[in-house]
Amino acid sequence: MCSFFLCQTGKQAKISMGEENQTFVSKFIFLGLSQDLQTQILLFILFLIIYLLTVLGNQLIIILIFLDSRLHTPMYFFLRNLSFADLCFSTSIVPQVLVHFLVKRKTISFYGCMTQIIVFLLVGCTECALLAVMSYDRYVAVCKPLYYSTIMTQRVCLWLSFRSWASGALVSLVDTSFTFHLPYWGQNIINHYFCEPPALLKLASIDTYSTEMAIFSMGVVILLAPVSLILGSYWNIISTVIQMQSGEGRLKAFSTCGSHLIVVVLFYGSGIFTYMRPNSKTTKELDKMISVFYTAVTPMLNPIIYSLRNKDVKGALRKLVGRKCFSHRQ
């Protein structure tokens, strides 16, 4: 596998296929989201705002959880991991997209494309696993509150976090290896705005069935399996909440779980649409719009959803702001 990657680095390395000479692709060209100049300027402004909100929002969540001792609980430990994953997820794609809005020729090197896919899949698949872990945490908190502290220990939280990142790394390694094991000769124009396996496979010079099946199998592992766990957890949560006598307890449970459920629907819905259906020979505009949703919009919405619907996070923010105001007065 490594030797195959090394042979791709030669600029315009010549090979022979039958009687016809072809060249290995050394870089890819994106068609982007639009070819219209005015539309690209508007998209640049929109994506810049989204990216700034993503960075500021997720960094704020990470800082608040680190500084406020009241947020040193399993739920916020996993939320901090999720915010970090969102930050890496968006940063692996959006800055390059912003640059491409300002230039006529939108290119990326072969190795740059490979690196982008590795990071994108690593943090994206890790986020899938983290959302499943967070649903299990909510299940234990709502359905087994008396055993919560003994089940969700620090050691268990660290282990679940490690397994989430390890599963993301495994899926990233498998999908990237299968994608770049294929030969890419001659054609190098990607009808997309970043390197994503389904779009890249359309340029492969041989049949991609085995690679598509490998990516589909990994999708089952990292998308459908966690979704099944999430659905099972929420089925038990809803059953428990309905039986609660306290109206305040019901409201608190639905508020806490509601934020997580919104994030799950947004992220998994778009991910399953892209990776769990047959790969067509052409990239449709709808495919690119769905990709925008989970690469740019969802990472921006996550901190907003969790902070606006969470009293603890809002309390930590008020405490931090009050501390800053007090220090300025002194």
Curated annotation (Swiss-Prot):
Organism from which the protein derives: Homo sapiens
Cytoplasmic-facing ranges: 66-73, 137-155, 236-252, 309-330
CDD domains, per database record: 7tmA_OR2D-like
Keyword Transmembrane helix: yes
Described function: Odorant receptor.
Spans through the membrane: 42-65, 74-95, 117-136, 156-174, 212-235, 253-275, 289-308
The encoding gene: OR2D3
InterPro entries, sorted: GPCR_Rhodpsn (IPR000276), GPCR_Rhodpsn_7TM (IPR017452), Olfact_rcpt (IPR000725)
One Pfam family in the UniProt entry: 7tm_4
Keyword Cytoplasm on entry: no
Matches recorded under PANTHER family: OLFACTORY RECEPTOR (PTHR26453)
Similarity comment text for this entry: Belongs to the G-protein coupled receptor 1 family.
Topological type in the membrane: Multi-pass membrane protein
One GO location term (cellular component): plasma membrane
Predominant localisation class: membrane
Protein localization: Cell membrane
GO MF annotations, alphabetized: G protein-coupled receptor activity; olfactory receptor activity
Record keywords: Cell membrane, G-protein coupled receptor, Glycoprotein, Membrane, Olfaction, Receptor, Sensory transduction, Transducer, Transmembrane, Transmembrane helix
Lineage: Eukaryota, Metazoa, Chordata, Craniata, Vertebrata
Classification via Gene3D superfamilies: Rhodopsin 7-helix transmembrane proteins
Membrane topology (Extracellular): 1-41, 96-116, 175-211, 276-288
Gene Ontology biological-process annotations: detection of chemical stimulus involved in sensory perception of smell
Name used for this protein in its record: Olfactory receptor 2D3
Glycosylation sites noted in the Swiss-Prot or TrEMBL record: 21
